[in-house]
């Protein structure tokens, strides 16, 4: 043991000397780079050589760190073993026996935290060793010819001086205002998200992001996920997997052997999270070699998989808060106390990376905010959303249902089918105005089609496949490959471009059973899918047409929307000149369209840039439904060509993938919740209710209902003798009939009806012919407020 201690001391001493050399060399490289900006001759001559020296020393240091950690771990293990042997020969004291009994009693109590797993202690020991012996950033030590003064410009504000490797964004913020520093969630340094307590490394532009910023929210919820992860480790003792921020909150997945999470345990987890928050545990960042992290997380096969499969660099980062140390790129808030309000509200089961053949994981969801008022507003919002839940409305209004014998495939009842068909009729009318041609394509294809399109290699697990006469077939999950066959079935000329194919074909996707959720996530659905085959020079005009199309549809529904242009990603296919031209035309289309839009650099698909559209519903939620996506790759894969003006028959078209509703099922869910079940007349599954004042008028009521039905309205008659007239009217209003037509002897004589609305606005006696004519005009115009416009 003494020999190992001496070896560890020698390695540590050598490591310290080399780290001093690295600090000096790093500072020298930075100085030379700064000089290069002012006078490039010297910086160009010496910079590369010194950079290579730094890299060589750092590589050697990584090896030394691993040796040092190994030596110290073995040394610590030997000490624990010897201490254990010594303790085994000592009889327990009376107090120790009492403590042991108390611990056992505590662990046996239901709802109490389990004993802290052994791996937590071992993980912490290694982290502390690494933290002591391997500081992430060079210390600020004065060296010959080293200038540590840096310029820090606060975005939109003043410029201050700082010290390299020492000044932090938090100090910069505090220098402006303590209140500003306390309310800042995260910093952005030279365009990169940065921990507030992480020292700056050179001249910097610093942005200070508050919670109202989307990136800051993601960081805030990511830090909250770490708090939840710490609580889950303490409570369940399982192995953590992924814990990301999501659109509204966060979750953490955990593998727990032989048990599942119960919703009754969520309040206990929430209390542990609140304790962690009170402790104000700092978030500590450390960059560590991949090999050392494999040793640190050897107890957790999921973290080891991430390291082996996802990390392609020699080092990566971990973050610590309290006893939790987690693989994480960060950044994070300063400490757990920054989370002022937290709620753990839901749990479910899932699979490792969504693969049903892999391990089952327990997923727990949470939400957090920087003040309690925001939490109360969120809870109020959840109650409102719950009352508008499309599954609740679908059941109450008898629109649709699901059955275990066909999970993920909706059964639309007559009134739900009316809404479905009304939406498709609306889009068909728009197709006719905009020169789209509707086509019908097969539901199943040989797998060779999907191999050609590239979907088989990347998407086959999400397809329903089966064997037919020794060949593999699949139900189509999208229409585009079939439309490529339709375009290619005969020669095409520039004269017929653009070709616009529209298809309401049935699509199937093999979604995991645990992800199915009402109409928003299904296995069987239809889209208002269209593919435009056009020449490159036609892109701008076609995109403008798509934008006006979606504006027309969304304004009819009463939706506002956001536009985002996603441009060329780092890894893309195709010629850069074509990408540049396509992006230029997309930008021109957006500018001419005249609505606000943002750019998402590098967020396009690998096969083409796109415009993402999010609609905003009545309670402020955003939903992505429409898609406008350019595709340069499918025309190549299917060898699509057209004959140009000069007779060249090898010209490639560009494909524009375009959907407005997206999935019709999902749009019905969104519309149900947006309207809260109060459908506008043209979409309403209950448009007219006819109510006779007594038995003598029932035949006339049936006649009025028949006339309405023959004109295309969803009309019903209430002939229930057990209800009073007022009760019948109230029932019709609660059932959301847009118009209630009351008929008595007077109306019967005058061939009229007495009109009132579901909001009890009384329009009085009107002839049945006039009522039907007005209703037809209101339905045709697709007005949102037919009851007011009547």
From Swiss-Prot:
CDD domains: TGS_ThrRS, ThrRS_anticodon, ThrRS_core. SUPFAM superfamilies: Class II aaRS ABD-related (SSF52954), Class II aaRS and biotin synthetases (SSF55681), TGS-like (SSF81271), ThrRS/AlaRS common domain (SSF55186). It catalyses: tRNA(Thr) + L-threonine + ATP = L-threonyl-tRNA(Thr) + AMP + diphosphate + H(+). Its main location: cytoplasm. Residues 80-117 are annotated as: Disordered. Pfam families: HGTP_anticodon, TGS, tRNA-synt_2b, tRNA_SAD. One of its GO terms (cellular component) is nucleus. Its EC number is 6.1.1.3. Changing residue 222 to A: Impairs post-transfer editing activity but no effect on aminoacylation activity. It comes from the Eukaryota. GO terms for biological process: threonyl-tRNA aminoacylation. InterPro entries: aa-tRNA-synt_IIb (IPR002314), aa-tRNA-synth_II (IPR006195), aa-tRNA-synth_II/BPL/LPL (IPR045864), Anticodon-bd (IPR004154), Anticodon-bd_dom_sf (IPR036621), Beta-grasp_dom_sf (IPR012675), TGS (IPR004095), TGS-like (IPR012676). GO terms for molecular function: ATP binding; threonine-tRNA ligase activity. A motif (Nuclear localization signal) lies at residues 774-780. May be a component of the multisynthetase complex (MSC), a large multi-subunit complex which contains at least eight different aminoacyl-tRNA synthetases plus three auxillary subunits AIMP1, AIMP2 and EEF1E1. Interacts with the MSC components EPRS1, AIMP1, AIMP2 and KARS1. Belongs to the class-II aminoacyl-tRNA synthetase family. This is Threonine--tRNA ligase 2, cytoplasmic. It comes from Mus musculus. The lineage of its organism: Eukaryota, Metazoa, Chordata, Craniata, Vertebrata.
């Amino acid at each position: 043991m003494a020999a190992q201690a001496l070896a560890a001391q020698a390695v540590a001493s050598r490591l310290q000397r080399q780290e001093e050399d690295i600090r000096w060399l790093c500072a020298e490289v930075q100085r030379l780079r700064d000089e290069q900006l002012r006078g490039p001759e010297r910086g160009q001559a010496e910079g590369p050589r010194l950079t290579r020296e730094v890299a060589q020393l750092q590589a050697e240091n990584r090896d030394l760190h691993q040796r040092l950690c190994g030596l110290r771990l073995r040394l610590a293990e030997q000490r624990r073993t010897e201490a254990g042997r010594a303790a085994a020969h000592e009889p327990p004291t009376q107090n120790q026996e009492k403590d042991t009994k108390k611990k056992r009693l505590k662990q046996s109590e239901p709802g109490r935290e389990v004993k802290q797993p052994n791996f937590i202690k071992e993980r912490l020991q290694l982290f502390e060793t690494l933290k002591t012996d391997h500081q992430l950033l060079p210390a600020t030590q004065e060296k010959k010819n080293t200038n540590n003064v840096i310029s820090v410009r606060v975005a939109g504000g003043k410029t201050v001086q700082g010290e390299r490797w020492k000044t932090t964004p938090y100090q910069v913020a505090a220098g402006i205002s303590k209140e500003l520093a306390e309310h800042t969630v995260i910093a952005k340094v030279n365009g990169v998200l940065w921990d507030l307590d992480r020292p700056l490394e050179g001249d910097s532009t610093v942005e200070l992001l508050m919670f109202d910023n989307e990136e800051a929210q993601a960081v805030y919820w990511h830090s909250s996920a770490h708090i939840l992860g710490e609580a889950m480790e303490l409570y369940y003792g399982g192995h953590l997997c992924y814990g990301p921020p999501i659109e509204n909150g966060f979750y953490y997945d955990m593998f727990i052997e032989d048990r599942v999470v119960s919703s009754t345990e969520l309040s206990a987890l929430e209390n542990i999270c609140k304790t962690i928050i009170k402790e104000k545990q700092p978030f500590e960042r450390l960059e560590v070699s991949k090999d050392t992290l494999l040793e640190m997380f050897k107890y957790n096969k999921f973290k080891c998989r991430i390291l082996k499969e996802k990390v392609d660099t020699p080092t990566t980062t971990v973050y610590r808060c309290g006893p939790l140390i987690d693989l994480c790129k960060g950044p994070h808030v300063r400490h757990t106390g920054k989370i002022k309000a937290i709620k753990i509200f839901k749990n479910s089961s899932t699979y490792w990376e969504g693969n049903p053949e892999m391990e089952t994981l327990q997923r727990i969801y949470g939400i957090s905010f920087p003040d309690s008022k925001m939490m109360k507003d969120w809870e109020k919002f959840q109650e409102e959303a719950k009352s508008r839940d499309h599954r609740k409305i679908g059941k109450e209004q008898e629109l649709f249902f699901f059955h275990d014998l066909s999970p993920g495939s909706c059964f639309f009842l007559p009134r739900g089918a009316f809404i479905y068909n009304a939406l498709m009729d609306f889009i068909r009318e728009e197709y006719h105005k905009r020169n789209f041609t509707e086509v019908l394509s097969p539901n199943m294809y040989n797998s060779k089609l999907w191999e050609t399109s590239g979907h088989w290699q990347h998407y086959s697990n999400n397809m329903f496949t089966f064997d037919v006469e020794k060949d593999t077939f699949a139900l189509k999950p999208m229409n585009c490959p079939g439309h490529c066959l339709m375009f290619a079935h005969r020669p095409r000329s520039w004269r017929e471009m653009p070709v616009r194919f529209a298809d309401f074909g049935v699509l199937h996707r093999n979604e995991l059973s645990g992800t199915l959720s009402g109409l928003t996530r299904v296995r069987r659905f239809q889209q208002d899918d269209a593919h435009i085959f056009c020449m490159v020079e036609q892109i701008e005009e076609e995109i403008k047409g798509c934008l006006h199309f979606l504006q027309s549809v969304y304004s009819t529904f009463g939706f506002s929307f956001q536009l985002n242009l996603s441009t060329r990603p780092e890894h893309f296919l195709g010629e850069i000149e074509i990408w540049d031209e396509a992006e230029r035309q997309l930008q021109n289309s957006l500018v001419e369209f005249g609505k606000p839009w943002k750019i998402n650099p590098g967020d396009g698909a690998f096969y083409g840039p796109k415009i993402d559209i999010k609609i905003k519903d009545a309670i402020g939620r955003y939903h992505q439904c429409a898609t406008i996506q350019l595709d340069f790759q499918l025309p190549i894969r299917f060898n699509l060509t057209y004959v140009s003006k000069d007779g060249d028959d090898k010209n490639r078209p560009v494909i524009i993938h375009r959907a407005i509703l997206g999935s019709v099922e999902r749009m019905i869910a969104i519309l149900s919740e947006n309207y809260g079940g109060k459908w506008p007349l043209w979409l309403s599954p209950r448009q007219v209710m006819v109510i006779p004042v007594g038995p003598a008028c029932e035949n006339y009521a049936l006649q009025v209902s028949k006339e309405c039905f023959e004109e295309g309205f969803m009309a019903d008659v209430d002939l229930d003798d057990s209800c009073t007239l007022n009760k019948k009217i109230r029932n019709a209003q609660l059932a959301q009939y847009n118009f209630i037509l009351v008929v008595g002897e007077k109306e019967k004589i005058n061939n009229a009806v007495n009109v009132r609305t579901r909001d009890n606005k009384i329009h009085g006696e009107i002839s049945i012919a006039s009522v039907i004519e007005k209703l037809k005009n209101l339905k045709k115009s697709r007005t949102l407020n037919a009851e007011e416009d009547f």
